[in-house]
Curated annotation (Swiss-Prot):
It is an enzyme of class 6 (ligase). Beta-alanine binds at Q61. CDD domains: PanC. ATP binds at residues 30-37, 147-150, 176, 184-187. GO terms for molecular function: ATP binding; pantoate-beta-alanine ligase activity. (R)-pantoate binds at Q61, Q153. This is Pantothenate synthetase. It holds the Pfam family Pantoate_ligase. It comes from Thermoanaerobacter sp. (strain X514). GO terms for biological process: pantothenate biosynthetic process. Homodimer.
Amino acid sequence: MIVTDKISDVRNIIKEQKLSGKKIGLVPTMGYLHEGHLSLVRIAKKHSDFVAVSIFVNPIQFGPNEDFDRYPRDLERDLKLLEKEGCDLVFAPSVEEMYPSELLTTVNVDKITEKLCGAFRPGHFKGVTTVVAKLFNIFTPDIAVFGQKDAQQVAVIKKMVEDLNFPVEIIKAPIVRESDGLAMSSRNVYLNPEERKAALILSKSLKEAEKLLLNGERNANTIIKKVNEVLNSEPLCKVQYVSCVHPDTLEDLTYIKDKALIAIACFIGTTRLIDNLLWGENI
């Protein structure tokens, strides 16, 4: 496994691999890897011949009062995990390497970034699309794998790729959960034992939504109401939003015809957690 913090190294390595006919797979991460991230690496391995992982806590996607400084980091541990998975290349740049001078060019996807998480984290998705566009230009991957837990991020990146003709296929990977149902997240480390228990309310509320859907309920408001009810039954849970949208366009749904995404964001104590249920689409 090659590890580098230099863009020029990545370019040379990828060029070599492409010349020998290899298909390049990219898994962009912010590090502090968990089983969810590792599942993305496994999916990338299935769809490509050379798997690259980027580890970069991207400052421009954090708001002024968000957790950039305390976001968990452990590169040594991450590298051990990736080595075990048979990853080929790890790119772990410094902020200076990625943003050597004042950043005057950004990539912004309109409209679908203004709802769900975007409504509460202004500028967040602009930071995401800008860094992902940079990574796509650095790696020129054939495929890139993103987790369904960040459902809005996947939709936004897919739109950017479509609109700007990036020659990369975006593969969506299913949410990986702890044995008790909590969606895996690097931010789960912030939860104390009491909050960790309370956080199960997110997946419980989505289970209730799924039950309604399986029983034939198609009215989005009925489902949203039920999810809110379950979430509000947990005193430590402060709901930020519950939405029922189309998974590709993120348009609000009133009636569920085929595909739907039930997306939620809550604070458990001071930790913001997101989760979702994808209905009518197999990934």
